[in-house]
Amino acid sequence: MDLKRFIRDIPDFPQKGIVFRDITPLLRNQEAFKEAIDRMCELVFDKEFDLVVAPEARGFILGAAMAYKLGKGFVPVRKPGKLPYKTVYEEYQLEYGTEQLHIHEDAIEKGQKVLIVDDVLATGGTAEALIRLVKKLGGEVVSLAFLVELSYLEPRKRLEGYDVKTLIVY
């Protein structure tokens, strides 16, 4: 199945000059969504890890589904003020601004192996912040899996030395 045909391009969103890759048509189609999750799981079948870590909002959708299918725990990473317990955070640059990512301070035990999952790999800034959060808590990132990669932004330069997997490349 060509999953790319389920990704909608939204020009000038969230600001002028940005082409937003909207995955909601893929999520709405049960066959495409199932295919995407199955194929993302296949990308990491040979990796040994304990937890799937994913950021809100669309990362939750993919990450939680993958964690369920792979029989792993799921750790949500959220924006400021959204998690109820004590957190640690990292600040990072987006394609269109600055943001913070927070994780519960006890979400990852020292030495646990982690798969990071998100919907889009754009500049690599979010992924870098997620890696720093995992390391801050004593975890080890074994791989990163993304539904979409915007290769023209060269995000892999920021993730050198990490195993990066993507399904759909622009």
Swiss-Prot record:
Organism the protein comes from: Thermotoga sp. (strain RQ2)
Coiled coil stretches, renumbered: none
Location in the cell: Cytoplasm
One GO biological process term: AMP salvage
Role, per record: Catalyzes a salvage reaction resulting in the formation of AMP, that is energically less costly than de novo synthesis.
Record flagged with keyword Glycosyltransferase: yes
Keyword Cytoplasm: yes
Protein's recorded name: Adenine phosphoribosyltransferase
Enzyme Commission number(s) of this protein: 2.4.2.7
Pathway(s) served: Purine metabolism; AMP biosynthesis via salvage pathway; AMP from adenine: step 1/1
Similarity field: Belongs to the purine/pyrimidine phosphoribosyltransferase family.
Keyword field: Cytoplasm, Glycosyltransferase, Purine salvage, Transferase
